[in-house]
Design a protein with these regions (language model features):
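Secretory targeting signals
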Residues: 1-3, 16
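Structural detector for short beta-strands of small beta-barrel domains
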Residues: 34-55, 152-174
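Core hydrophobic alpha-helical transmembrane segments of single-pass membrane proteins
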Residues: 13-21
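Short boundary/loop segments of OB/S1/cold-shock single-stranded nucleic-acid-binding domains
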Residues: 22-34, 138-153
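OB-fold/S1-family single-stranded nucleic acid-binding modules
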Residues: 113-142, 218-240
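OB-fold (S1/OB) nucleic-acid-binding surfaces
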Residues: 52-84, 171-190
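N-terminal export leaders
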Residues: 7-10
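Short nucleic-acid-contacting surface segments enriched for D/E, G, S/T with interspersed K/R
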Residues: 82-83, 89-109, 195-213
Length: 240
């Protein structure tokens, strides 16, 4: 299922130039390391000041990934620390705009800054672009598949997709995170082979529903192309 493309802003110094977004996301040339969606329960939004920004507040938020997960931290496939809940920064105006969504299951579209400007612009290097309720008014997720190559094992997992991202500087990779099962703190990182499957992964995330994810485990992995040995080759809806 194709995700709707939208226009974006190209940040060049202090000048914003409209361009076509990459994979449906806002693109900031030279300033963005990753961009994508995360799904879960929105349970905190706040405005706060620090000694670096005494005269202006910055918005901060927390998203508990998936359904009924708890506080945890672990090392991701790329070696970076992953935290649940996921912390993000926003403008004061965005905090007010999205406050009615507190306590609901939502999808957050974000971009991650290449260079941290946390001292004056927020506590994190993640900036939100929009927050939407999951599932509301969206068509059911359809089945999608690609062929897998070089596999030494294969299988299917049932779970919710809680993260869909495009990341990297010169070489871009498509990655996702799956909450295995119906709830809890078991998260599995997987790589996405192409943009068509990435669109399907993102559509599954926006639905908020569990899906059956078919994958192969590749013997050889090019780290420039993907973060994990697990490659998604098919997604289909789970009958309730």
């Amino acid at each position: 299922m194709a995700v709707r493309r939208r226009s974006a802003l190209l940040l060049a110094g202090a000048v914003a130039v409209p361009v076509v977004g990459i994979g449906g996301y806002v693109a900031y040339s030279g300033s963005t390391y990753s961009q994508g969606w995360r799904m879960g329960q929105l349970f905190k939004l706040s405005n706060r000041r620090s000694w670096q920004r005494l005269f202006m507040a910055a918005g901060e938020g927390e998203l508990s990934l998936g359904q009924d997960s708890s506080r945890a931290a672990w090392a991701g496939a790329d070696g970076q620390s992953v935290q649940n809940p996921w912390l993000f920064s926003a403008s004061v105006e965005q905090i007010a705009q999205y406050e009615p969504l507190l306590g609901r299951s939502v999808a957050v579209r974000y971009h991650q800054l290449q260079k941290k400007l946390t001292a004056f612009h927020g506590d994190t290097d993640y900036r939100i672009d929009e927050i939407v309720p999951v599932g509301a008014g969206r068509p059911p997720v359809g089945a999608c598949a690609v062929s897998g190559r070089g596999a030494r094992s294969s299988g299917t997992r049932i779970g919710r997709i809680v993260k869909s991202t495009v990341k990297g500087t010169l070489a871009k990779t498509h990655e996702c995170t799956v909450q295995v099962g119906n709830s809890g703190n078991v998260f599995l990182e997987m790589s996405v082979p192409n943009e068509a499957m990435h669109d399907c992964v993102t559509a599954s995330l926006l639905s908020g529903q569990p899906v059956a994810i078919s994958y192969v485990e590749n013997i050889i992995r090019n780290p420039l192309n993907r973060d994990t040995n697990y490659e998604i080759v098919g997604i289909r809806p789970v009958e309730s």
